[in-house]
Amino acid sequence: MAFRMKLVVCIVLLSTLAVMSSADVYKGGGGGRYGGGRYGGGGGYGGGLGGGGLGGGGLGGGKGLGGGGLGGGGLGGGGLGGGGLGGGKGLGGGGLGGGGLGGGGLGGGGLGGGKGLGGGGLGGGGLGGGRGGGYGGGGGYGGGYGGGYGGGKYKG
């Protein structure tokens, strides 16, 4: 009797796994409540190819805390610590093309920079933004127009 019960439980578990794999994993979907998935899918709070969710990401990013991957995603765009090629918006954005909180994000930047707290990178930015320039340029605290290699004007 105990053996039959174990056999039934095993069959149920295997069939459940098979359904989950066909429905989620191979369609790029979930894989857990707070993230996962074979193709970068979120799960729980996101899902799909390039999903999202808490700790999501993958190709195309998606939305949710901790997004990212190619094309950004996350909380408003880049997510907490997001970024990737194309950046996006949200705390900690960045990557190629900038993004982040208002542009560069907290510590953001990347090629093309942008505006926001701690911007910079190639094309600069900075706290309050402005238009950055050069390698690590930027307007400094409050903006202005940056230029040269790390140069730029400082406007308090």
UniProtKB/Swiss-Prot annotation:
Keywords: Amidation, Antibiotic, Antimicrobial, Fungicide, Immunity, Innate immunity, Secreted, Signal. It is found in: Secreted. The modification Lysine amide is found at residue 155. GO terms for biological process: antibacterial humoral response; antifungal humoral response; innate immune response; killing of cells of another organism. Expressed in hemocytes and secreted into the plasma following bacterial immune challenge. The keyword Secreted applies. The keyword NAD does not apply. Residues 1-23 form the signal peptide. GO terms for cellular component: extracellular region. It comes from the Eukaryota. Belongs to the glycine-rich peptide family. Antimicrobial protein. Strong activity against the Gram-negative bacterium E.coli SBS363 and yeast C.albicans. No detectable activity against the Gram-positive bacterium M.luteus. This is Acanthoscurrin-1. It comes from Acanthoscurria gomesiana (Tarantula spider).
